[in-house]
């Protein structure tokens, strides 16, 4: 009787671990993590048109390649 109980417990553990491995675990959304992404320089961002060059008009620091906005993009 004890052997049967142990066998049933082992079978239950194996089935539960198999269900977790197949994807029955957590269902939370995974964030995209870019570990190997290359960070671009300000010049590369400007060249590709992703940001505004210095002395051009701006409304927020995110628009400027240097992230310094005072009505126009500044170098410092």
Curated annotation (Swiss-Prot):
Alphabetically ordered keywords of this record: Cleavage on pair of basic residues, Disulfide bond, Knottin, Neurotoxin, Secreted, Signal, Toxin
UniProt xrefs under InterPro entries: Conotoxin
Domain of life: Eukaryota
Distribution of this protein across tissues and organs: Expressed by the venom duct.
Gene Ontology cellular component list: extracellular region
Localization per Swiss-Prot or TrEMBL: Secreted
Prosegment residue ranges: 20-37
Molecular function as annotated in GO: ion channel inhibitor activity; toxin activity
One Pfam family matching this protein: Conotoxin
Cleaved signal peptide residues: 1-19
Main location: secreted
Disulfide linkage: 51-65, 58-69, 64-73
Family: Belongs to the conotoxin O2 superfamily.
Domain remark from Swiss-Prot or TrEMBL: The presence of a 'disulfide through disulfide knot' structurally defines this protein as a knottin.
Protein name from the UniProt record: Conotoxin VnMEKL-021
